[in-house]
């Protein structure tokens, strides 16, 4: 059953786009020039107690445990990372929420370009305060390990009106070819023509064998000159993931030790503060399937330098109440 969690982690890594140098520099400049009003944010809900919302009284569902999963756009084993330059960005972000009483799992996806408050640091690690910027670059102001994950945990919690987050798990790009080769590759039918001009072998309708050598270009490539190009590749990612799940399930059925070995193969590319007991609980709950999948509401727009996802804060508060709270009167 570890297979389900591993494949969730793989899904997070399928996000892309890497503008570390330009975006972190721009964020630092904005942080240096902001005033105290820019640093305030009023949440409509909280992570504990009761709240009054649109005429009703709600209580946070304290049976929930929420875990942050991140896909990182950098390479190499994480134990080699030392500074901000090594960290990369959290280009795929979602929260897995488990109800310990009902063993139900819900998933909330957070678009990588969501504009929100992040904490900015200079290269020596000194905080420059908060700035409104893409949530995915919050990871870049850490060390690529626990510090980066903790920063993302805080940023995501703040975006979600103080939602408590009990743990995190991230995996970087090098995990994609490793896990693809470990299952022996997968065969896919190219779902669209989004790669055809750049990689003719990926013509729409073509049947292609995906291996560790070509997996990344199939799932991650996008034309960064086109607005909202991160959304275009989603169908390819879905196709890859479905094929990967099927192949991994076949392998797991043939070999009882396959899943444990698969996890060992990607450990060098992951960062987590979640113990085996937490994964075991998630795995048990995952047997019931995912009961709800949501995306932070908003609209993609072209920013001055990069794509932006403008979060609809009112709709987000509605979603937070419906996913994480219970009405008591």
Region annotations inferred by a language model:
Residues 3-15:
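Hydrophobic membrane-insertion alpha-helices, especially the h-region
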Residues 15-329:
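Non-catalytic, solvent-exposed segments at the cell envelope interface
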């Amino acid at each position: 059953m570890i297979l389900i969690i591993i494949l969730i982690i793989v899904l997070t890594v399928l996000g892309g786009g890497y503008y570390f140098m330009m975006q972190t520099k721009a964020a630092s400049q904005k942080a240096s020039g902001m005033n105290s009003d820019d640093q305030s944010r009023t949440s409509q809900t909280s992570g504990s107690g009761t709240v009054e919302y649109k005429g009703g009284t709600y209580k946070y569902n304290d049976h929930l445990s929420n875990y942050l999963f991140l896909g990182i756009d950098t390479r190499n084993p994480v134990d080699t990372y030392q500074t901000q330059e090594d960290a990369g960005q959290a280009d795929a972000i979602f929260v897995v929420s488990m109800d310990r009483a009902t063993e139900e799992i819900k998933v909330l996806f957070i678009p990588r370009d969501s504009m929100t408050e992040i904490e900015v640091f200079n290269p020596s690690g000194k905080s420059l305060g908060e700035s409104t910027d893409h949530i995915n670059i919050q990871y870049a102001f850490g060390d690529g390990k626990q510090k980066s994950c903790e920063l993302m945990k805080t940023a995501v919690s703040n975006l979600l009106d103080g939602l408590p987050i009990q743990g995190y798990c991230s995996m970087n790009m090098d995990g994609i070819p490793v896990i693809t080769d470990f299952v022996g590759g997968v065969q896919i039918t190219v779902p669209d023509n989004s790669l055809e001009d750049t990689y003719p072998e990926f013509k729409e309708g073509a049947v292609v064998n995906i291996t560790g050598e070509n997996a990344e270009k199939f799932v991650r490539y996008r034309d960064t000159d086109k607005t909202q190009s991160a959304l275009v590749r989603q169908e390819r990612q879905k196709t890859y993931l479905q094929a990967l799940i099927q192949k991994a399930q076949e392998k797991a059925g043939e070999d009882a030790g396959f899943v444990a070995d698969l996890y060992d193969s990607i450990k060098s590319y992951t960062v987590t503060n979640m113990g085996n007991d937490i994964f075991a609980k998630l795995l048990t709950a995952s047997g019931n399937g995912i009961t709800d999948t949501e995306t932070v509401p908003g609209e993609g727009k072209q920013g001055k330098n990069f794509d932006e996802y403008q979060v609809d804060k009112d709709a987000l508060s509605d979603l937070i109440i419906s996913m994480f709270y219970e009405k008591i009167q």
